[in-house]
């Protein structure tokens, strides 16, 4: 449950045009949005309709300006409208938007992913959901098995079989699963607590020779931010292989965000299959999955496991993604770490001064705030926090010109575009935000 801010905390900015356009949107779009978290459902108040972004800033259609700490939920690692990415997109678009045929850009982007990670072959798709859906299908086809093991609070896109205990998307609405996901769809999905190797071993013992794969976020970012405990991902791979199953590591969020090599660069664990998105897209609809060459060889047209897409490998998206990855050189990541350290330091200082119990959940450059004492290690821990403090905290930041994810269960993302002036704006907004969190009342 969340404590909704009182009326004095909501919409002190002029948001009349956002309200008008949002009302217009609700007439033609369910809930007025095309992804639920954008509706401000868990924090209340008027969702902002964004007009443009540049560097570290966003502007809504009413002219309100914000420091951007959402980064489009991860892709905008270089900030908004980076000139090199914009130029690459414009050049590619001028040559044609889509051909339904092979292009050079597909191979260039795939080569770049292979060069920086442990995957040997790559298939390009349009979204993270497509990537995880296809990776699971491939794992089932390769192993000849049906069951999939996933973790509570880990989100792998809106795939029916993976929406059980799926974290932020459904947690925002306090729904354990999505209506429309049938029992048959989820019947082969086994769900266990995150960071619990004993539960994983018990699941394999209960279903010997039946589990096709384990799928896990390389570091969880959809129950808030929860890093895997030391050795967790390596143990998952060992357990899976001992039973003839595969390990799928979902790096849609962590890939090329947490290090030059993604989470693989942090713990050195190579998934048999790995999914990528967000940063790899540069902000356009693109994603990928890849892995061991022998596994990928089962994918059509080389093998019998079917996967296809009219717009997969779209040349404009390939240009955007390649430009994004080329900018994300090894020198970028220490700067991102510095920005994350500086930001979390300011948050801790403000919340501590206001007497608010909290813990900063970190996974390298990704983080979230747990409004409780101590670190959360799984979804139950994150749900047990004082999440009702988040909505007043969020709105005070928004009024102070700082745009953060509108859910206690979403991860915050820094960009390389943040400036000293941005941190001054953030610091000024954090004091009233911390006070708002401190004065929040637990819902009855």
Swiss-Prot record:
It catalyses: (S)-4-amino-5-oxopentanoate = 5-aminolevulinate. Keywords: Cytoplasm, Isomerase, Porphyrin biosynthesis, Pyridoxal phosphate. GO terms for biological process: protoporphyrinogen IX biosynthetic process. It is found in: Cytoplasm. The modification N6-(pyridoxal phosphate)lysine is found at residue 278. The keyword Membrane does not apply. Its cofactor is pyridoxal 5'-phosphate. GO terms for cellular component: cytoplasm. InterPro entries: 4pyrrol_synth_GluAld_NH2Trfase, Aminotrans_3, Aminotrans_3_PPA_site, PyrdxlP-dep_Trfase, PyrdxlP-dep_Trfase_major, PyrdxlP-dep_Trfase_small. The keyword Isomerase applies. It comes from the Bacteria. Pathway: Porphyrin-containing compound metabolism; protoporphyrin-IX biosynthesis; 5-aminolevulinate from L-glutamyl-tRNA(Glu): step 2/2. Pfam families: Aminotran_3. GO terms for molecular function: glutamate-1-semialdehyde 2,1-aminomutase activity; pyridoxal phosphate binding; transaminase activity. Its EC number is 5.4.3.8. It is an enzyme of class 5 (isomerase). Disulfide bonds: none annotated. Belongs to the class-III pyridoxal-phosphate-dependent aminotransferase family. HemL subfamily. NCBIfam families: hemL, PRK00062.1. Homodimer. This is Glutamate-1-semialdehyde 2,1-aminomutase.
């Amino acid at each position: 449950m969340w404590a909704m801010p009182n009326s004095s905390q909501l919409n002190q900015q002029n948001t009349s045009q956002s309200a008008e356009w949002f009302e217009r949107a609700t007439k033609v779009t369910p809930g007025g949005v095309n992804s639920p978290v954008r509706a401000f459902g868990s924090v209340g108040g008027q969702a902002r309709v964004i007009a443009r972004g540049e560097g570290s800033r966003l502007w809504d259609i009413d002219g309100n300006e914000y420091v951007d700490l959402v980064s489009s939920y991860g892709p905008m690692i270089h900030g908004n409208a980076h000139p090199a990415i914009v130029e690459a997109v414009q050049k590619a678009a001028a040559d044609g938007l889509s051909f339904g045929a092979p292009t050079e850009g597909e191979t260039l982007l795939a080569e770049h992913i292979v060069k920086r990670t442990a995957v040997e072959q790559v298939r390009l798709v349009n979204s993270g959901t497509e990537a995880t859906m296809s990776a699971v299908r491939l794992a089932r086809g390769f192993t000849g098995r049906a069951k999939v093991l996933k973790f509570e609070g880990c989100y792998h896109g809106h795939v029916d079989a993976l929406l059980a205990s799926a974290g932020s998307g459904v947690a925002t609405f306090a729904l354990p699963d999505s209506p429309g996901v049938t029992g048959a769809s989820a019947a082969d999905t086994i769900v266990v607590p995150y960071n619990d190797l004993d539960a994983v071993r018990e699941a394999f013992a209960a279903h010997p020779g039946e589990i096709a794969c384990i799928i896990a976020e390389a570091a969880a970012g959809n129950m808030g931010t929860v890093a895997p405990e030391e050795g967790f991902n390596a143990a998952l791979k060992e357990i899976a292989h001992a039973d003839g199953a595969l390990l799928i590591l979902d790096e849609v969020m962590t890939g090329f965000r947490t290090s030059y090599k993604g989470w693989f660069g942090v713990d050195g664990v190579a998934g048999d299959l790995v999914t990528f998105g967000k940063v790899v897209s540069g902000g356009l609809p693109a994603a990928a999955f890849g892995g061991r060459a022998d596994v990928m060889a089962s994918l059509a047209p080389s093998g019998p496991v079917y996967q296809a897409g009219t717009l997969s490998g779209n040349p404009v998206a390939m240009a955007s993604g390649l430009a994004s990855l080329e900018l994300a050189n090894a020198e970028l990541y220490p700067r991102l770490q510095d920005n994350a350290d500086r930001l979390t330091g300011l948050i801790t200082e403000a919340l501590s001064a206001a007497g608010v119990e909290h813990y900063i959940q970190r996974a390298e450059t990704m983080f979230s705030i747990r409004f409780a004492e101590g670190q959360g290690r799984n979804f139950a821990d994150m749900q047990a926090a004082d999440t009702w403090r988040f909505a007043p905290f969020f709105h005070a930041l928004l009024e102070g010109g700082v745009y953060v994810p509108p859910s206690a269960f979403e991860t915050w993302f820094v960009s390389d575009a943040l400036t000293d002036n941005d941190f001054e704006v953030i610091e000024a907004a954090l004091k009233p935000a911390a006070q708002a969190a401190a004065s929040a009342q637990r819902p009855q």
